Every structure is written in C-alpha cells, then in structure tokens.
Amino acid sequence: MEKPAVANHPHAALPPAPGADRHHCLDFADTAATLPAGQSYDLLAAPDSAMRWLATHDLTTPDVQLYEVCAQRMRTLRGHVRALFAARVEGVAPPEESLRAVNQALTAVPSAPLLAWDGAQGLRRVQAHPTDQAVNHALATIAADAADLLTGPDADLLAACGSAPCDRFLLRTHGRRHWCSTRCGDRARAARAYARRNDTSE
C-alpha cells in the first residue's frame, strides 16, 4: 500500500491539491504518491520529514520528538485514509480494516479535557494523555477531518487525479476539474493532443 521514498521529493515543486486548504486529511493522503513522470515520493518516510509535515500543519509543536514507530503509525493511517478515499471515488464499499483504523484513531484521545479533583486545587480540567503522546492527538485530528470529508458535502467533490499514473486525491473545486495540479492537467491535455494527431495521420 505504501510507496518507496525518494531522496529529493518532487512533491516540493507541486502545489497542494485543490481542497487541501479545507481538509488537512487530503494533504495527508497525498504525502505519498506517484506523479505523471513516474516519480514517487513519501513525505512521511522518515521521522524528521514526518515531524516537518505535522508542524507545518499545526498538528504538533517543533519541540516534540518523533520516533520511527510514530512515523510508521502515520504511514499506516495514511494507507487506510487513501483506501477510504479510493472506495468513495470508485463508489464501492470501504474496507472494514480501514474503517476500524480510522475509528481507532478517533477514539485514541478524548475530545475534551476531563474533569479531575485534587486536594490542593479542587476541581479542574486535565488532559487524559500527556504531551509525549502528541502523535495520538495529531492522528485523531486527521481521522476526524477524514470522517468529516467522507460524510459531508465535500464528499461528492472528492476525486483521484485523472493524469495517470499520478494518484493524488483532490476536491473538484472548479467544475469538472480532474487534475491535482496544472502540471498534471497540461500533461493530460498534451497526451490527448498527441493521440489525436496519431489518429489523423493513420
């Protein structure tokens, strides 16, 4: 389900896919993809790059230490989110294991501080999970956003990029747009023009 990482991410030259500004889960799903030229990238391939992605999206603070086990958990959830997106786009039933994985992420942390009592301070609100479990909070936030996207009005706009082999996801924010970037759109149009020229020359 996961793709190998490359040293120099071609993703750096690509803008976020349409809709990523409204849904972090869309950008999360697109942290691994194959682009039209056949290049692949994985922005969660290592703890440092995974940490940068979380910090860039305000899902944690730069002082949090991220380990490989945490990056692996992020990659695993990403695979399940991508599977749910693909099922929605294809109009088929989602994989049960992916539903379970997203629900587990959703319930891994409380949605609000709990009520606690101690003799010195009396009643107060406390977080049930310490700050060293910041990844749990980040994954819960991503899972909640994915659930909101898949069950909300934007679900009908969810699409896979139509410029094979690119497999990024996007929201069709403008008409019938089916490309995740201008680069993919230009490539698809060029391929169609080339095919038409070949047809007329035969």
Where do the language-model regions lie?
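Short helix-coil boundary/hinge micro-motifs
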Residues: 1-160, 168-169, 200-202
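Cys/His-rich microdomains that often coordinate metals
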Residues: 165-170, 188
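Cysteine-rich micro-motifs
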Residues: 175-187
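Short, cysteine/histidine-rich loop/knuckle motifs that typically chelate Zn2+
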Residues: 160-165, 182-183
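A broad detector of short, well-ordered amphipathic alpha-helices
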Residues: 144, 188-191
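Contiguous alpha-helical segments
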Residues: 192-202
